[in-house]
Regions:
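Ser/Thr- (and often Asn-) enriched beta-sheet segments in non-cytosolic proteins
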Residues: 52, 60-64, 89-93, 113-115, ...
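Oligomerization/assembly interface segments of phage tail-like spikes and tubes
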Residues: 82-102, 173-189
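Exposed beta-sheet edge/beta-hairpin loop segments within beta-rich domains
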Residues: 81-85, 129-133, 166-176
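A glycine-rich, hydrophobic loop/mini-helix early in the fold
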Residues: 44-88
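Short helix-loop boundary/capping segments
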Residues: 101-157
């Protein structure tokens, strides 16, 4: 007696899990607390809590995760018996479109100092950025929207800005951009993704 028909019935995919849209990048001094869970998606709560919004970007924010590994091999097996992680690079990259001195400092390592001179007699007001190669650590967070329309937050407690920066001064080709590369310098166990899934019950 023949068996049951052989069927091909793949599981259903969830189209609403396919996400798109911008991520908002905030930076802060190391140790700055995140907003309360209730306010993770509220931009003003970040700013009032000591975080700085980097502003407009050229092509959004990118997350780059690159582990380096070492294969453990034995003669009796063609594939590795284990793959050991030797180091990990986690970077948040973007190109800043808003040319403020704070953003220039962030792109150039976040080690500079800003001083403000008030206007006075024969003295125009000015702000001076003095750069430094003593790069300073900072915290960063990327806030996006999840499939429920709530906030999803990548929190990296300690990063350093240490990437190459090339800014073109052109008459009309494009805006002046300041590329930023924020490299995680904290243990991976300190990095977290927070996903809001439901409103509070009261």
């Amino acid at each position: 007696m023949p068996g049951a028909p052989l069927l091909y019935t793949p599981p259903n995919y969830v189209a609403t899990n396919v996400l798109y849209g911008i991520g908002v990048l905030f930076t802060a001094p190391v140790g700055t607390a995140l907003p309360s869970d209730q306010n993770l998606g509220v931009g003003s709560s970040w700013v009032s809590g000591g975080w700085t919004y980097v502003g407009a970007t050229d092509q959004g924010v990118s997350l780059n995760y690159a582990p380096s590994t070492n294969d453990i091999n034995i003669e009796e097996q063609t594939t590795p018996v284990a793959v050991i992680v030797t180091n990990v690079s986690l970077q948040i990259t973007t190109s800043l479109s808003e040319e403020t001195l704070a953003n220039v400092n962030l792109a150039y390592g976040n080690g500079g100092s800003l001083s403000v001179t008030a206007p006075g007699a024969s003295q125009p007001g000015k702000t001076t950025l003095v750069l430094s190669t003593s790069f300073a650590s900072l915290a960063c967070a990327v806030v996006g929207k999840n499939q429920l329309g709530f906030a999803r937050v990548l929190s990296v407690p300690t990063v350093m800005s240490a990437g190459s920066v090339k800014t073109d001064f052109r008459r009309a080709a494009n805006a002046r951009l300041y590329p930023v590369t924020l490299s995680a310098t904290c243990p991976m166990s300190s990095v977290s993704l927070i996903d809001l899934t439901a409103i509070a019950t009261s």
